[in-house]
Each structure stands twice: as structure tokens, then as C-alpha cells.
Amino acid sequence: MRSAQVYRWQIPMDAGVVLRDRRLKTRDGLYVCLRDGEREGWGEISPLPGFSQETWEEAQTALLTWVNDWLQGSEGLPEMPSVAFGASCALAELTGVLPEAADYRAAPLCTGDPDDLVLRLADMPGEKIAKVKVGLYEAVRDGMVVNLLLEAIPDLHLRLDANRAWTPLKAQQFAKYVNPDYRARIAFLEEPCKTRDDSRAFARETGIAIAWDESLREADFTFEAEEGVRAVVIKPTLTGSLDKVREQVAAAHALGLTAVISSSIESSLGLTQLARIAAWLTPGTLPGLDTLHLMQAQQIRPWPGSALPCLKREELERLL
């Protein structure tokens, strides 16, 4: 006997979270809880403003329609990426497809003061990998900060994310301030330039490896082995169903590329599922999930070791 519940939620964000020149004051989303007999599965649907094609309101309409169809016995999935991902996660939990084992390691994220990152890395066991957002300030400053971090921590490897912020000139200004001896320890730089061709040229000219992120969601993108391209960064909330995520990971691995499962600033419930997906599909690769500290609360399922308060399902607004 199938049954389902849908919850709507809103989490206050820390001041200073900016996405595409727009301050994110709250993170808004939905949960779906599916039941079939004794089994239960949860999924999170939280379109990311400025990045997702769909709005939160559109996702809510699509989710409620899909849940009603599922209750009638339908087996299909919705079209919208965030809804398809959340629904497929709930189904994967319900059927036991999504393993429980999780990779709760996360590459620490530096969005501001590099001194904070140095302190966090000092306590990090094993392989030291961190992520730094670049392109928010002057390219020269970004280059100096990256150089400083690589110089200060000799066993550090950095993942950088520019979100296509730079012109070729700005990208070259960044590279100019990174010691060529340190560039090999830049694991990859996500989408440095506004176009893929400019990003490819940057990789060839500087020896700094790049990764595709936004490109994966463009209609003309194909998986290819290319000089200077080392990785793909997969954000499941923006990608679609769990099957589509699996297909992209498999396509990347077949070409010898690193596939990194990455957060779209999901709640703790969504992040714990991403940690399980990472352990399952990309074992041995540190996922990019260090975004919980941007929020003021957790929900339903806490992230291990987090001191943030965790809301229970009874405290959320139920829609169905």
C-alpha cells in the first residue's frame, strides 16, 4: 500500500551567502517521503536560485503532481532536474538501491578569509584537499591568495571554482600570480572563462587543469577526453535523476576523468544523501559537500559532527 507525505521548508542562511550577485537569505525547498508497506524513502527537492531552470514554486507543483501519479501506481519520473533528483532518491531509498554507506569527508570550502582555511586544514587528517571560490574579487587577489595557500601548506591540493567569471585577460592575470611550481597542485579550476574555448585555451597556456561544471547541463556538451581537462563536477540537484547522475559519472570515468559529486547548498538531509551517492558512485574521490556551515539549522537527518540544531519532521510545514 503506497502512501506519501510532502513537506515545505525554509532555512535561514548565514549573512554573506551570495549567488550570482544575489544574496541568499534563506534556502527554500521540499521533502517527499514515500512509503510502500514497511519501507520508506526520502528525497529533497531544492532548486538553487540563479542556477536551476525551475523555481521553487514550479518544483512544488511538479512534485505534488508526480506524487499523486505515483500513489496511483505510476512508475515514471518528473522532467524538472531538482524534482527528478529528489523523487529518484526517495525511490532509491524505498527500494534499497541507494546504499547506506556514506563518505562524510568534505573538501573544506573557503569563500572569504584564507587564514580560516589554513586553520581548518591543520586539523584535517589524510589527504589535504580544499575548495576556493575565485572570481568574486579581483583576479590578481585570487591569484595571490591561491599562491599563498599552496606555499603555506606544501601537501595541499586545491580545487578552484570560477563559475565562468573571467575574461581570458582576467584568467591570465590570475595565473600570473600563481607560481608555476605550484600549479600542479591545483587539482582543477572549474570553468575559468565565459566560454569553453577560452577555458580550454587557458588550460593549454598555463598548465592549470580545468574541470567542467555548468557545461554538463548545456545541450551541446559531450563527454570527451581533452588536453587540460581533468575532471567533471556533478551537482545532482541541477542534473536530474539518479540514473542520469550515474550515466554522467560512468561517462567521465570511461575517459579517465575524475567525477566529483558536489553540493547545490542542500539541507542536511540532502547532503547526507549526496555523501552516500559519492561513496557509491565515486569511491575514493573527496566530494564537494562543505556547505552546511552556510546554514543556521539542520533538518530530519543531521550531518555527523555538526553542532547545528536539527529540526524534526513535525516542525516542518506539511503540504500532503
From Swiss-Prot:
UniProt keywords (A-Z) are: Lyase, Magnesium, Menaquinone biosynthesis, Metal-binding
Recorded GO molecular functions are: hydro-lyase activity; magnesium ion binding; O-succinylbenzoate synthase activity
Catalytic center at which residues?
133 (proton donor), 235 (proton acceptor)
Enzyme nomenclature, EC number? 4.2.1.113
The UniProt entry's sequence similarity note says: Belongs to the mandelate racemase/muconate lactonizing enzyme family. MenC type 1 subfamily.
According to its UniProt record, what is one Pfam family this protein matches?
A: MR_MLE_C
Q: Which reaction does it catalyse?
A: (1R,6R)-6-hydroxy-2-succinyl-cyclohexa-2,4-diene-1-carboxylate = 2-succinylbenzoate + H2O
Please give the PANTHER family that the UniProt record associates with this protein: O-SUCCINYLBENZOATE SYNTHASE (PTHR48073:SF2), O-SUCCINYLBENZOATE SYNTHASE-RELATED (PTHR48073)
For this entry, the protein name equals o-succinylbenzoate synthase
Any one GO biological process: menaquinone biosynthetic process
Q: Identify the species of origin.
A: Salmonella typhimurium (strain LT2 / SGSC1412 / ATCC 700720)
> Per the entry, which co-factors are needed?
a divalent metal cation
Identify the metabolic or biological route this protein is part of.
Answer: Quinol/quinone metabolism; 1,4-dihydroxy-2-naphthoate biosynthesis; 1,4-dihydroxy-2-naphthoate from chorismate: step 4/7; Quinol/quinone metabolism; menaquinone biosynthesis
Q: What does this protein do?
A: Converts 2-succinyl-6-hydroxy-2,4-cyclohexadiene-1-carboxylate (SHCHC) to 2-succinylbenzoate (OSB).
Q: Keyword Repeat: yes or no? A: no
Into which EC class is this enzyme placed? Answer: lyase
Instruction: Identify the coding gene.
Output: menC
On whether Lyase is a keyword of this UniProt record, the answer is yes
Residues the entry annotates as binding Mg(2+): 161, 190, 213
